Amino acid sequence: MPSQFFGLNTAYKGLLASNAALNTTSNNISNVQTKGYSRQQVVQQASDALRVFQTYGCAGAGVDTIAIERVRNEFYDTKYWGANTNMGEYSIKQYYMQQLETYFSDDGKTTGFKTIFDQFSVTGLQAVLKAASDKTTKAQFIGYAGNLTEYFRSMVGNLEKVQKDANQELKLKVDEINSLAGEIASLNKQINVIELTGSKANELRDRRTVLLDQLSNIVDIQTQEIPITDANNPDRETGAYRFLVRIGGG
């Protein structure tokens, strides 16, 4: 038969579980505006019942708080990273295509290749063919040829500038990738230190996910989390994980 304090202990465990749930709810509300924060929930399970050898069988022993976990679906993270990679790629392409479009523009406000070439091949050349001995016509044709030459010279300079800008941005992106990779590696170590004790490093995992969001906007990524097992007992998981990030399908 359980002691007289058994019911009090059951109630006490219920209060502890409710307090954990209340604190978790407060934390969720406080972080509503926090970038990358994942809502957390308390995982509870019924305590092992006590055998009392009575007709009603076992006496319930209350509730145990198992863990506080993130409410997050890795499937949607993977889908988001794929879409984010595409968006980053197309944004860069759009930017440089707009640069090229500006240089090749011929819309009436900006004199472009079509206008200059038409002046040279249609207006100037046809005039020379009709009046080959006219010095004014020849001079005008030479002027159109000079404009076309200057256009190509200017276009070469503009395209070289675009290429230089693209190379510079590529270097900056490589530096950014290396920086993000270093931060992710550092967080992995911190997460393992905490989770080896059986706790959940929810906030650190959120920070790592934010970094992965940023990384996926630059390059295609795939992630894999592999449990680390005890070297002396391969069937026993230590609680730590080896977190792998593959970049560009590597």
Where in this protein do the model-derived segments appear?
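Bacterial Type III/flagellar export signals at protein N-termini
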Residues: 1-123, 127-141, 146, 153-154, ...
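Conserved acidic
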Residues: 14, 112, 176, 200, ...
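Interfacial residues of coiled-coil/leucine-zipper alpha-helices
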Residues: 19, 184, 188, 208-209
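An alpha-helix initiation/capping motif
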Residues: 118, 142, 178, 202-210
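Long, non-coiled-coil amphipathic alpha-helical linker/lever segments
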Residues: 145-192
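Aromatic-residue-lined binding/catalytic grooves and analogous aromatic/hydrophobic interfacial grooves
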Residues: 194-201, 205-212, 217-218, 227
